């Protein structure tokens, strides 16, 4: 990639690449940076040659549009391309991007399991949920602590001699009341969630 050219006489927008200028220049090659005809000299990028990046028009997030006279965002001077590529150009406004980004990212990144709090891909969601629900809760042995043993990581208070504790199979120890509260919501050791 070459160096970025700058000119003192050209004004800058508060956000690079965002402008009210509505011009886009079609690319002469399949993927690259191109100068637009507007005052800002904005760039358009064609992603039509990138495999798997040709979604239907209804699935495109705001700011991405197909070039061509029959599209909602693609019409206008200088944006037509015989290949019908997908462009991100000066027509992509900051408001459009901020409006769609949280929903688009959330829809494509999976979900957080309410049982184990792991992030799971959306195609594995059902199987993961079944596995989490069928996993048995950890059992523990309750005991009375014979000597001071550091800190309970749930309540962050000291484990003192004489406290009623719970010892998990992984040998972690907690106040019995703390781990009982923890197991009402979770099914794993607070320090070893993957076990």
From Swiss-Prot:
Its main location: other. Its EC number is 2.3.2.27. It holds the Pfam family zf-RING_2. The keyword Acyltransferase does not apply. It catalyses: S-ubiquitinyl-[E2 ubiquitin-conjugating enzyme]-L-cysteine + [acceptor protein]-L-lysine = [E2 ubiquitin-conjugating enzyme]-L-cysteine + N(6)-ubiquitinyl-[acceptor protein]-L-lysine. Residues 18-29 have a biased composition (Low complexity). Residues 1-37 are annotated as: Disordered. Residues 1-10 have a biased composition (Polar residues). Keywords: Endosome, Lipoprotein, Lysosome, Membrane, Metal-binding, Myristate, Transferase, Ubl conjugation pathway, Zinc, Zinc-finger. A zinc finger (RING-type) spans 152-193. Pathway: Protein modification; protein ubiquitination. Coiled coil: none annotated. GO terms for molecular function: ubiquitin protein ligase activity; ubiquitin-protein transferase activity; zinc ion binding. One of its GO terms (biological process) is proteasome-mediated ubiquitin-dependent protein catabolic process. The keyword Oxidoreductase does not apply. It is found in: Endosome; Lysosome; Membrane. The RING-type zinc finger domain is required for E3 ligase activity. This is E3 ubiquitin-protein ligase ZNRF1. It comes from Xenopus laevis.
